[in-house]
Regions:
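Short acidic/His-enriched helical or mixed secondary-structure segments at domain edges of catalytic enzymes
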Residues: 153-172, 250-269, 307-316, 360-413
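M16/MPP (pitrilysin/insulinase) zinc-metallopeptidase core fold and M16-derived inactive scaffolds
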Residues: 63-123, 186-187, 299-315, 328
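M16/insulysin-pitrilysin zinc metalloprotease superfamily fold
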Residues: 90-93, 120-151, 281, 300, ...
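Buried hydrophobic packing residues in well-ordered domains
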Residues: 46, 64, 81-83, 103, ...
Length: 471
Protein backbone atom coordinates (compact mmCIF):
# COMPACT_ATOMS: atom_id res chain seq x y z
CA UNK A 1 0.00 0.00 0.00
CA UNK A 2 2.84 2.34 0.94
CA UNK A 3 4.68 1.60 -2.35
CA UNK A 4 1.50 2.25 -4.32
CA UNK A 5 1.02 5.63 -2.60
CA UNK A 6 4.61 6.65 -3.30
CA UNK A 7 4.27 5.58 -6.94
CA UNK A 8 1.07 7.59 -7.37
CA UNK A 9 2.74 10.62 -5.77
CA UNK A 10 5.72 10.37 -8.14
CA UNK A 11 3.41 10.07 -11.15
CA UNK A 12 1.42 13.09 -9.92
CA UNK A 13 4.55 15.26 -9.50
CA UNK A 14 5.90 14.10 -12.86
CA UNK A 15 2.63 15.06 -14.52
CA UNK A 16 2.77 18.54 -13.00
CA UNK A 17 6.38 19.05 -14.11
CA UNK A 18 5.57 17.90 -17.64
CA UNK A 19 2.59 20.23 -17.75
CA UNK A 20 4.80 23.12 -16.62
CA UNK A 21 7.35 22.34 -19.32
CA UNK A 22 4.69 22.03 -22.00
CA UNK A 23 4.59 25.17 -24.16
CA UNK A 24 1.52 27.36 -23.82
CA UNK A 25 -0.91 27.13 -26.72
CA UNK A 26 -0.62 29.95 -29.20
CA UNK A 27 -3.54 32.35 -29.50
CA UNK A 28 -6.06 31.24 -32.08
CA UNK A 29 -6.71 33.08 -35.29
CA UNK A 30 -8.95 36.10 -34.76
CA UNK A 31 -12.50 35.41 -35.94
CA UNK A 32 -13.52 36.92 -39.24
CA UNK A 33 -16.54 39.17 -38.99
CA UNK A 34 -18.64 39.62 -42.10
CA UNK A 35 -21.19 42.38 -41.78
CA UNK A 36 -23.48 42.58 -44.76
CA UNK A 37 -23.71 46.02 -46.35
CA UNK A 38 -27.21 47.51 -46.41
CA UNK A 39 -29.13 48.43 -49.52
CA UNK A 40 -30.28 52.02 -49.20
CA UNK A 41 -32.76 54.50 -50.58
CA UNK A 42 -33.87 57.99 -49.53
CA UNK A 43 -37.41 59.33 -49.48
CA UNK A 44 -38.20 62.81 -50.77
CA UNK A 45 -38.71 64.02 -47.19
CA UNK A 46 -35.13 63.07 -46.26
CA UNK A 47 -35.71 59.76 -44.46
CA UNK A 48 -32.80 57.43 -45.23
CA UNK A 49 -33.73 53.74 -45.34
CA UNK A 50 -31.22 50.88 -44.98
CA UNK A 51 -32.21 47.27 -45.61
CA UNK A 52 -30.08 44.25 -44.69
CA UNK A 53 -31.53 40.95 -45.89
CA UNK A 54 -30.88 37.95 -43.65
CA UNK A 55 -33.05 34.91 -44.28
CA UNK A 56 -31.55 32.55 -41.69
CA UNK A 57 -34.43 33.09 -39.25
CA UNK A 58 -38.04 34.15 -39.93
CA UNK A 59 -37.72 37.42 -38.02
CA UNK A 60 -37.46 41.11 -38.90
CA UNK A 61 -36.40 44.15 -36.87
CA UNK A 62 -37.15 47.79 -37.62
CA UNK A 63 -35.16 50.61 -36.05
CA UNK A 64 -36.24 54.22 -36.61
CA UNK A 65 -33.61 56.63 -35.27
CA UNK A 66 -33.47 60.43 -35.23
CA UNK A 67 -29.95 61.83 -35.35
CA UNK A 68 -30.76 65.37 -34.21
CA UNK A 69 -28.38 67.73 -32.48
CA UNK A 70 -28.89 68.04 -28.72
CA UNK A 71 -31.04 71.02 -27.79
CA UNK A 72 -31.60 73.11 -24.68
CA UNK A 73 -35.04 72.88 -23.07
CA UNK A 74 -34.42 75.77 -20.67
CA UNK A 75 -37.28 76.77 -18.37
CA UNK A 76 -39.31 73.81 -19.65
CA UNK A 77 -36.71 71.14 -19.01
CA UNK A 78 -38.66 67.90 -18.90
CA UNK A 79 -40.71 68.46 -22.04
CA UNK A 80 -38.65 65.95 -24.02
CA UNK A 81 -38.71 63.28 -21.31
CA UNK A 82 -42.46 63.73 -20.86
CA UNK A 83 -42.98 63.37 -24.60
CA UNK A 84 -40.70 60.35 -24.61
CA UNK A 85 -42.88 58.67 -22.00
CA UNK A 86 -46.14 59.54 -23.76
CA UNK A 87 -45.38 58.50 -27.32
CA UNK A 88 -46.40 54.94 -28.13
CA UNK A 89 -49.72 54.99 -26.28
CA UNK A 90 -51.62 54.07 -29.40
CA UNK A 91 -52.12 56.63 -32.15
CA UNK A 92 -54.74 59.06 -33.39
CA UNK A 93 -55.97 56.22 -35.61
CA UNK A 94 -55.83 53.31 -33.13
CA UNK A 95 -56.83 53.46 -29.45
CA UNK A 96 -54.19 52.63 -26.85
CA UNK A 97 -55.74 49.34 -25.69
CA UNK A 98 -56.45 48.08 -29.20
CA UNK A 99 -52.91 49.05 -30.26
CA UNK A 100 -51.27 47.14 -27.40
CA UNK A 101 -53.59 44.13 -27.73
CA UNK A 102 -52.73 43.71 -31.40
CA UNK A 103 -49.01 43.87 -30.68
CA UNK A 104 -49.40 41.19 -28.01
CA UNK A 105 -51.56 39.04 -30.28
CA UNK A 106 -48.89 39.12 -32.99
CA UNK A 107 -46.17 38.25 -30.48
CA UNK A 108 -44.23 41.37 -31.47
CA UNK A 109 -42.21 43.91 -29.56
CA UNK A 110 -42.52 47.65 -30.19
CA UNK A 111 -40.93 50.52 -28.27
CA UNK A 112 -41.29 54.25 -28.90
CA UNK A 113 -39.42 57.31 -27.71
CA UNK A 114 -38.72 60.92 -28.54
CA UNK A 115 -35.62 59.84 -30.50
CA UNK A 116 -37.24 57.09 -32.58
CA UNK A 117 -38.87 53.67 -32.40
CA UNK A 118 -37.98 49.99 -32.51
CA UNK A 119 -39.95 46.87 -33.44
CA UNK A 120 -39.29 43.18 -33.95
CA UNK A 121 -41.59 40.39 -35.06
CA UNK A 122 -41.95 37.22 -37.08
CA UNK A 123 -41.44 38.02 -40.74
CA UNK A 124 -44.97 36.90 -41.66
CA UNK A 125 -46.32 39.79 -39.58
CA UNK A 126 -43.67 42.31 -40.62
CA UNK A 127 -45.96 44.34 -42.87
CA UNK A 128 -48.51 44.94 -40.13
CA UNK A 129 -45.84 45.60 -37.49
CA UNK A 130 -44.18 48.22 -39.69
CA UNK A 131 -47.61 49.77 -40.19
CA UNK A 132 -48.17 49.91 -36.42
CA UNK A 133 -44.70 51.38 -35.89
CA UNK A 134 -45.36 54.10 -38.47
CA UNK A 135 -48.78 54.77 -36.95
CA UNK A 136 -47.47 55.14 -33.42
CA UNK A 137 -44.41 57.18 -34.37
CA UNK A 138 -45.92 59.54 -36.94
CA UNK A 139 -49.41 59.93 -35.46
CA UNK A 140 -48.97 59.83 -31.66
CA UNK A 141 -52.00 60.21 -29.46
CA UNK A 142 -51.02 62.92 -26.96
CA UNK A 143 -53.96 63.20 -24.56
CA UNK A 144 -54.45 65.30 -21.44
CA UNK A 145 -55.12 62.16 -19.41
CA UNK A 146 -51.78 60.56 -20.36
CA UNK A 147 -50.00 63.89 -19.91
CA UNK A 148 -51.29 64.30 -16.35
CA UNK A 149 -50.42 60.70 -15.50
CA UNK A 150 -46.83 60.84 -16.81
CA UNK A 151 -46.21 64.27 -15.32
CA UNK A 152 -47.30 63.03 -11.90
CA UNK A 153 -44.86 60.11 -12.19
CA UNK A 154 -41.95 62.42 -12.99
CA UNK A 155 -42.84 64.78 -10.13
CA UNK A 156 -42.95 61.84 -7.74
CA UNK A 157 -39.55 60.72 -8.99
CA UNK A 158 -38.07 64.18 -8.41
CA UNK A 159 -39.35 64.20 -4.83
CA UNK A 160 -37.88 60.76 -4.21
CA UNK A 161 -34.46 62.00 -5.39
CA UNK A 162 -34.37 65.14 -3.23
CA UNK A 163 -32.11 63.55 -0.60
CA UNK A 164 -30.53 60.87 -2.79
CA UNK A 165 -26.77 61.39 -2.66
CA UNK A 166 -26.10 59.60 -5.99
CA UNK A 167 -28.84 61.64 -7.71
CA UNK A 168 -27.46 64.90 -6.30
CA UNK A 169 -23.92 63.92 -7.31
CA UNK A 170 -24.94 63.03 -10.87
CA UNK A 171 -26.86 66.27 -11.31
CA UNK A 172 -23.97 68.42 -10.07
CA UNK A 173 -21.41 66.48 -12.14
CA UNK A 174 -23.32 67.22 -15.35
CA UNK A 175 -24.08 70.84 -14.41
CA UNK A 176 -20.47 71.69 -13.54
CA UNK A 177 -18.82 69.68 -16.32
CA UNK A 178 -21.01 71.00 -19.16
CA UNK A 179 -22.61 74.15 -17.77
CA UNK A 180 -26.30 74.60 -16.97
CA UNK A 181 -26.96 76.25 -20.34
CA UNK A 182 -25.78 73.18 -22.23
CA UNK A 183 -28.07 70.25 -23.23
CA UNK A 184 -25.95 67.83 -21.19
CA UNK A 185 -25.72 70.13 -18.18
CA UNK A 186 -29.28 71.37 -17.68
CA UNK A 187 -31.47 69.45 -15.27
CA UNK A 188 -35.15 69.01 -14.58
CA UNK A 189 -36.68 70.50 -11.44
CA UNK A 190 -40.21 70.56 -10.08
CA UNK A 191 -40.57 74.12 -11.38
CA UNK A 192 -39.38 73.43 -14.94
CA UNK A 193 -41.62 70.37 -15.10
CA UNK A 194 -44.62 72.33 -13.85
CA UNK A 195 -43.97 74.83 -16.67
CA UNK A 196 -44.60 72.14 -19.30
CA UNK A 197 -48.07 71.94 -20.88
CA UNK A 198 -49.66 69.46 -23.26
CA UNK A 199 -49.29 72.05 -26.00
CA UNK A 200 -45.53 72.10 -25.32
CA UNK A 201 -45.38 68.32 -25.79
CA UNK A 202 -47.05 68.61 -29.18
CA UNK A 203 -44.87 71.54 -30.25
CA UNK A 204 -41.68 69.76 -29.18
CA UNK A 205 -42.71 66.66 -31.12
CA UNK A 206 -43.55 68.62 -34.27
CA UNK A 207 -40.26 70.52 -34.01
CA UNK A 208 -37.86 67.64 -33.48
CA UNK A 209 -39.58 64.44 -34.64
CA UNK A 210 -38.83 65.11 -38.29
CA UNK A 211 -37.38 63.05 -41.17
CA UNK A 212 -34.51 65.43 -41.95
CA UNK A 213 -31.95 63.47 -39.88
CA UNK A 214 -33.95 60.23 -39.58
CA UNK A 215 -32.88 56.70 -40.46
CA UNK A 216 -34.96 53.54 -40.78
CA UNK A 217 -32.88 50.37 -40.54
CA UNK A 218 -34.61 47.12 -41.51
CA UNK A 219 -32.85 43.82 -40.87
CA UNK A 220 -33.96 40.23 -41.30
CA UNK A 221 -36.12 37.92 -43.35
CA UNK A 222 -37.44 40.50 -45.76
CA UNK A 223 -36.79 41.42 -49.38
CA UNK A 224 -35.61 44.86 -50.40
CA UNK A 225 -37.85 45.06 -53.45
CA UNK A 226 -40.90 44.13 -51.38
CA UNK A 227 -40.34 46.39 -48.38
CA UNK A 228 -39.33 49.49 -50.37
CA UNK A 229 -42.85 50.34 -51.66
CA UNK A 230 -44.31 49.63 -48.20
CA UNK A 231 -41.91 52.11 -46.58
CA UNK A 232 -42.63 54.69 -49.27
CA UNK A 233 -46.35 54.32 -48.64
CA UNK A 234 -46.14 54.48 -44.83
CA UNK A 235 -43.45 57.15 -44.42
CA UNK A 236 -43.71 59.14 -47.65
CA UNK A 237 -46.33 61.48 -46.18
CA UNK A 238 -44.13 62.33 -43.18
CA UNK A 239 -43.89 66.10 -43.55
CA UNK A 240 -40.47 67.40 -44.56
CA UNK A 241 -39.20 69.83 -41.92
CA UNK A 242 -35.84 71.06 -40.64
CA UNK A 243 -34.90 71.16 -36.98
CA UNK A 244 -33.86 74.56 -35.60
CA UNK A 245 -30.14 75.24 -35.29
CA UNK A 246 -29.50 76.33 -31.73
CA UNK A 247 -26.26 77.72 -30.34
CA UNK A 248 -25.07 77.12 -26.79
CA UNK A 249 -21.74 77.63 -25.03
CA UNK A 250 -19.07 74.97 -25.45
CA UNK A 251 -18.06 73.30 -22.15
CA UNK A 252 -14.71 74.36 -20.74
CA UNK A 253 -12.47 72.33 -18.47
CA UNK A 254 -11.19 74.02 -15.33
CA UNK A 255 -7.78 75.75 -15.58
CA UNK A 256 -6.45 73.75 -12.62
CA UNK A 257 -7.46 70.62 -10.73
CA UNK A 258 -9.86 71.43 -7.93
CA UNK A 259 -12.31 69.89 -5.50
CA UNK A 260 -15.95 70.89 -6.00
CA UNK A 261 -17.75 69.92 -2.81
CA UNK A 262 -21.48 69.49 -2.23
CA UNK A 263 -22.57 69.19 1.39
CA UNK A 264 -25.24 66.51 1.86
CA UNK A 265 -25.80 66.17 5.63
CA UNK A 266 -27.67 62.86 5.35
CA UNK A 267 -24.86 61.17 3.38
CA UNK A 268 -23.41 58.00 4.90
CA UNK A 269 -20.69 57.77 2.25
CA UNK A 270 -19.09 60.13 -0.25
CA UNK A 271 -19.84 60.07 -3.97
CA UNK A 272 -16.53 60.94 -5.64
CA UNK A 273 -16.22 61.72 -9.35
CA UNK A 274 -13.15 62.91 -11.25
CA UNK A 275 -14.41 64.55 -14.43
CA UNK A 276 -13.16 66.33 -17.52
CA UNK A 277 -14.83 66.96 -20.87
CA UNK A 278 -13.37 65.89 -24.19
CA UNK A 279 -14.01 65.50 -27.89
CA UNK A 280 -13.50 61.92 -29.02
CA UNK A 281 -14.99 60.73 -32.30
CA UNK A 282 -15.31 57.06 -33.20
CA UNK A 283 -13.24 57.63 -36.31
CA UNK A 284 -10.34 59.22 -34.41
CA UNK A 285 -6.98 57.47 -34.33
CA UNK A 286 -7.08 57.41 -30.54
CA UNK A 287 -10.64 56.10 -30.19
CA UNK A 288 -9.75 52.49 -29.40
CA UNK A 289 -6.67 53.32 -27.28
CA UNK A 290 -8.75 55.79 -25.23
CA UNK A 291 -11.62 53.34 -24.72
CA UNK A 292 -9.26 50.52 -23.74
CA UNK A 293 -7.27 52.82 -21.43
CA UNK A 294 -10.51 53.76 -19.68
CA UNK A 295 -11.35 50.09 -19.22
CA UNK A 296 -7.91 49.38 -17.77
CA UNK A 297 -8.37 52.28 -15.35
CA UNK A 298 -11.86 51.39 -14.13
CA UNK A 299 -13.67 48.97 -16.42
CA UNK A 300 -14.01 45.86 -14.27
CA UNK A 301 -12.98 44.37 -10.94
CA UNK A 302 -9.41 43.78 -12.12
CA UNK A 303 -8.95 47.42 -13.17
CA UNK A 304 -6.51 49.79 -11.50
CA UNK A 305 -9.15 51.61 -9.48
CA UNK A 306 -10.92 48.48 -8.28
CA UNK A 307 -7.75 46.64 -7.36
CA UNK A 308 -6.77 49.63 -5.24
CA UNK A 309 -9.96 51.12 -3.77
CA UNK A 310 -11.93 47.87 -3.49
CA UNK A 311 -9.48 45.00 -3.14
CA UNK A 312 -6.54 46.62 -1.38
CA UNK A 313 -8.20 49.34 0.69
CA UNK A 314 -11.71 47.96 1.18
CA UNK A 315 -13.27 51.42 0.96
CA UNK A 316 -15.93 50.66 -1.63
CA UNK A 317 -17.94 47.94 -3.33
CA UNK A 318 -16.68 49.10 -6.71
CA UNK A 319 -15.25 51.92 -8.82
CA UNK A 320 -15.59 52.60 -12.51
CA UNK A 321 -14.45 54.82 -15.35
CA UNK A 322 -16.48 55.70 -18.43
CA UNK A 323 -15.54 57.70 -21.49
CA UNK A 324 -18.00 59.28 -23.90
CA UNK A 325 -17.54 59.59 -27.64
CA UNK A 326 -19.35 60.81 -30.71
CA UNK A 327 -19.97 63.94 -32.73
CA UNK A 328 -20.59 66.11 -29.69
CA UNK A 329 -18.61 66.97 -26.59
CA UNK A 330 -18.57 64.18 -24.00
CA UNK A 331 -16.88 63.45 -20.69
CA UNK A 332 -14.47 61.13 -18.94
CA UNK A 333 -15.64 60.21 -15.45
CA UNK A 334 -13.98 58.04 -12.82
CA UNK A 335 -16.27 57.49 -9.87
CA UNK A 336 -16.97 55.53 -6.71
CA UNK A 337 -19.05 55.64 -3.53
CA UNK A 338 -16.47 55.72 -0.73
CA UNK A 339 -16.73 55.28 3.03
CA UNK A 340 -16.88 58.80 4.54
CA UNK A 341 -13.85 58.31 6.77
CA UNK A 342 -11.71 57.44 3.73
CA UNK A 343 -12.84 60.29 1.46
CA UNK A 344 -9.59 62.27 1.50
CA UNK A 345 -7.46 59.13 1.18
CA UNK A 346 -9.57 57.93 -1.75
CA UNK A 347 -8.98 61.20 -3.60
CA UNK A 348 -5.24 60.63 -3.25
CA UNK A 349 -5.57 57.09 -4.62
CA UNK A 350 -7.78 58.19 -7.54
CA UNK A 351 -5.10 60.67 -8.57
CA UNK A 352 -2.40 58.05 -8.06
CA UNK A 353 -4.07 55.55 -10.41
CA UNK A 354 -4.75 58.14 -13.10
CA UNK A 355 -1.14 59.26 -12.86
CA UNK A 356 -0.05 55.63 -13.14
CA UNK A 357 -1.83 55.01 -16.44
CA UNK A 358 -0.40 58.28 -17.79
CA UNK A 359 3.21 57.60 -16.80
CA UNK A 360 3.66 53.80 -16.64
CA UNK A 361 3.25 51.49 -19.59
CA UNK A 362 0.51 48.94 -19.09
CA UNK A 363 1.77 45.36 -19.09
CA UNK A 364 1.40 43.45 -22.33
CA UNK A 365 -0.44 40.61 -20.55
CA UNK A 366 -3.02 42.94 -19.03
CA UNK A 367 -3.50 44.77 -22.31
CA UNK A 368 -3.95 41.50 -24.20
CA UNK A 369 -6.53 40.30 -21.67
CA UNK A 370 -8.53 43.50 -21.99
CA UNK A 371 -8.37 43.38 -25.79
CA UNK A 372 -9.47 39.75 -25.77
CA UNK A 373 -12.45 40.69 -23.64
CA UNK A 374 -13.45 43.47 -26.03
CA UNK A 375 -13.13 41.20 -29.03
CA UNK A 376 -15.16 38.47 -27.34
CA UNK A 377 -17.98 40.86 -26.51
CA UNK A 378 -17.92 42.27 -30.03
CA UNK A 379 -18.15 38.82 -31.61
CA UNK A 380 -21.15 38.02 -29.40
CA UNK A 381 -22.88 41.32 -30.15
CA UNK A 382 -22.38 41.10 -33.89
CA UNK A 383 -24.78 38.15 -33.99
CA UNK A 384 -27.69 40.33 -32.83
CA UNK A 385 -29.91 42.27 -35.27
CA UNK A 386 -29.95 45.26 -32.90
CA UNK A 387 -26.16 45.44 -33.09
CA UNK A 388 -26.12 45.25 -36.89
CA UNK A 389 -28.65 48.09 -36.97
CA UNK A 390 -26.52 50.14 -34.59
CA UNK A 391 -23.37 49.51 -36.63
CA UNK A 392 -25.14 50.57 -39.84
CA UNK A 393 -26.35 53.74 -38.12
CA UNK A 394 -22.93 54.50 -36.67
CA UNK A 395 -21.27 54.28 -40.07
CA UNK A 396 -23.74 56.87 -41.37
CA UNK A 397 -24.10 59.20 -38.40
CA UNK A 398 -20.47 59.09 -37.21
CA UNK A 399 -19.10 59.24 -40.77
CA UNK A 400 -17.06 56.08 -40.30
CA UNK A 401 -15.27 54.13 -43.03
CA UNK A 402 -17.51 51.51 -44.62
CA UNK A 403 -15.17 48.76 -43.35
CA UNK A 404 -14.96 50.12 -39.76
CA UNK A 405 -16.57 47.05 -38.20
CA UNK A 406 -14.90 44.56 -40.53
CA UNK A 407 -11.59 45.96 -39.26
CA UNK A 408 -12.79 46.27 -35.64
CA UNK A 409 -10.89 43.24 -34.33
CA UNK A 410 -7.74 44.03 -36.29
CA UNK A 411 -7.77 47.62 -35.03
CA UNK A 412 -8.17 46.54 -31.40
CA UNK A 413 -5.38 43.98 -31.70
CA UNK A 414 -3.08 46.69 -33.06
CA UNK A 415 -3.33 48.81 -29.88
CA UNK A 416 0.00 48.91 -28.02
CA UNK A 417 1.08 50.01 -24.52
CA UNK A 418 2.48 53.18 -26.11
CA UNK A 419 -0.94 53.90 -27.62
CA UNK A 420 -2.56 53.50 -24.20
CA UNK A 421 -0.14 55.94 -22.59
CA UNK A 422 -0.55 58.47 -25.41
CA UNK A 423 -4.35 58.35 -25.18
CA UNK A 424 -4.30 58.57 -21.39
CA UNK A 425 -2.12 61.68 -21.51
CA UNK A 426 -4.38 63.24 -24.12
CA UNK A 427 -7.77 62.57 -22.54
CA UNK A 428 -7.18 61.95 -18.80
CA UNK A 429 -6.60 65.58 -17.83
CA UNK A 430 -4.96 65.20 -14.46
CA UNK A 431 -4.11 68.91 -14.27
CA UNK A 432 -7.56 70.11 -15.40
CA UNK A 433 -9.89 67.80 -13.52
CA UNK A 434 -12.90 68.53 -11.39
CA UNK A 435 -12.95 66.31 -8.30
CA UNK A 436 -16.64 66.50 -7.49
CA UNK A 437 -17.60 65.15 -4.08
CA UNK A 438 -21.07 64.88 -2.56
CA UNK A 439 -20.85 63.91 1.08
CA UNK A 440 -21.29 64.84 4.72
CA UNK A 441 -19.23 67.99 5.02
CA UNK A 442 -18.86 68.00 8.79
CA UNK A 443 -17.05 64.66 8.57
CA UNK A 444 -15.00 64.96 5.39
CA UNK A 445 -14.09 68.63 4.80
CA UNK A 446 -11.27 68.77 7.42
CA UNK A 447 -9.47 65.84 5.79
CA UNK A 448 -9.97 67.20 2.27
CA UNK A 449 -8.51 70.58 3.24
CA UNK A 450 -5.26 68.87 4.25
CA UNK A 451 -4.74 67.72 0.65
CA UNK A 452 -3.86 71.28 -0.39
CA UNK A 453 -6.10 71.03 -3.45
CA UNK A 454 -8.15 74.20 -4.10
CA UNK A 455 -11.72 73.68 -2.85
CA UNK A 456 -14.94 75.31 -3.99
CA UNK A 457 -18.40 74.71 -2.60
CA UNK A 458 -21.72 74.20 -4.37
CA UNK A 459 -25.32 73.46 -3.45
CA UNK A 460 -27.18 70.38 -4.68
CA UNK A 461 -28.06 72.18 -7.93
CA UNK A 462 -24.51 73.20 -8.80
CA UNK A 463 -24.76 76.81 -7.62
CA UNK A 464 -21.69 78.31 -5.89
CA UNK A 465 -22.06 78.75 -2.12
CA UNK A 466 -19.89 79.67 0.83
CA UNK A 467 -18.04 77.03 2.81
CA UNK A 468 -20.42 75.36 5.28
CA UNK A 469 -20.00 76.36 8.93
CA UNK A 470 -20.42 73.66 11.56
CA UNK A 471 -20.82 74.18 15.30
Amino acid sequence: MKKTTILLFILFITGIMQAQNRPQPKPGVSPIVNIKKPQTFILDNGLKVMVVENHKLPRVTFNLALDNEPFVEGSKKGVDELGNNMIGNGSVKIAKDAFNEEIDFLGANINFGSKGAYASSLSKYSGRILELLANGALHPNFTQEEFDKEKAKLLEGLKAEEKSVPAIANRVVEALAFGKNHPSGEYMTEQTLQNVTLADIKTNYETYFVPENAYLVIIGDIKYNEVKPIVENLFGSWAKRKTPKLAYPAPQNVPFTQINFVDVPNAVQSEISLVNTLNLKMGDKDFFPAVIATYILGGDYSSYLNMNLREKQGWTYGANSIIGSGKYVAKLKSTSAIRSSATDSAVVEFIKEIKKIRTEKVSVDLLNNVKAGYIGRFVMQVQKPQSIARYALNIETEELPADFYENYIKTINAVTPDDIMRAANKYFLLDNTRIIIAGKGSEVIPGLEKLNIPMFYFDKYGNPVEKPVYK
